């Protein structure tokens, strides 16, 4: 049975599943759908065509599904789809998609979005991610699974961050980040590999292989793209080579890599 505060304002067109809790002074618009076990604390606003998955908890003053902050948006149909078991903390803002993107913003499962996180239109966030306080995502950003982003970090539109990456706090990131990399700075560059996450997700032999692969890729000569092409030719059947090198070759913004920055950090770690 759902538990709904008397002061909540809920459209009769909204779909509220069983076991949902809606706190005082929440506002729920026409196209909103709340799956089982969703919990809204007080003063949450949900608008637009917004779906919130099972057992997701949204804290006070979060605003989800309002019109995207894009001057090209003219009221066309778009969606915000949020998966299961997410924690969305105070004052978060998440916008739906636009006609100029994929027409939806997607958030996976088991993510933590801390206070004041902003997720702009057409972003795609995987699962098991942590976005710390004040992280700002511009439009069309793609974030893979198991990514951690430190507080007060700003990320440029269309940037792609692959699985298992760590972005240090107060960074300004304008380029793509391949799998398992650690990035820091303004402008942010790759400083090394995310050892902690790799140990959680991979076997030791696979970690060793990925380390060796990145050392080959990040040599000054040949270029990063040429190195990625060579690796794909020589190790076409290796899944890690496919994942990492294909990501590099598909990058439209370029990779956040500078030889001097990566090598200095790796030498310190070694």
From Swiss-Prot:
The keyword Acyltransferase applies. The keyword Transferase applies. PROSITE patterns: HEXAPEP_TRANSFERASES. It holds the Pfam family Hexapep. Signal peptide: none annotated. Substrate binds at residues 69-72, 121, 140, 157. Transmembrane segments: none annotated. Homotrimer. This is Acyl-[acyl-carrier-protein]--UDP-N-acetylglucosamine O-acyltransferase. The gene is lpxA.
């Amino acid at each position: 049975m759902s538990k709904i505060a008397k002061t909540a304002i809920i459209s009769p067109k909204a779909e509220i599943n069983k076991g949902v809790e809606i706190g005082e002074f929440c506002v729920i618009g026409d196209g909103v759908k709340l799956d089982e076990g969703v919990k809204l604390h007080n003063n949450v606003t949900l608008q637009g065509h917004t779906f919130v998955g099972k057992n997701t908890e949204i804290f006070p003053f979060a605003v989800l599904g309002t019109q995207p902050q894009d001057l090209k948006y003219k009221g066309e149909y778009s969606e915000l789809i949020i998966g299961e078991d997410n924690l969305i903390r105070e004052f978060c803002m998440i916008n739906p998609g636009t006609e100029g993107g994929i027409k939806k913003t997607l958030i996976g499962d088991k993510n933590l979005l801390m206070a004041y996180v902003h997720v702009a239109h057409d972003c795609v966030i995987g699962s098991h991610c942590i976005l710390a306080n004040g992280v700002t995502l511009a439009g069309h950003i793609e974030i893979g699974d198991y990514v951690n982003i430190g507080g007060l970090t700003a990320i440029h539109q269309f940037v792609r961050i692959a699985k298992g990456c760590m972005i240090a706090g107060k960074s300004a990131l304008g380029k793509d980040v391949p799998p398992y990399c650690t990035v820091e700075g303004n402008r942010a560059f790759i400083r090394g590999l995310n050892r902690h996450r790799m140990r959680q997700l991979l076997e030791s032999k696979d970690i060793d292989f990925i380390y060796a692969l990145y050392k080959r890729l990040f040599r000054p000569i040949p270029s990063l793209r040429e190195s990625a092409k060579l690796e794909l030719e020589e190790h076409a059947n290796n899944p890690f080579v496919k994942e990492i090198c294909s990501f590099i070759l598909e990058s439209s913004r370029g990779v956040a890599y500078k030889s001097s920055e990566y090598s200095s950090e790796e030498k310190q770690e070694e």
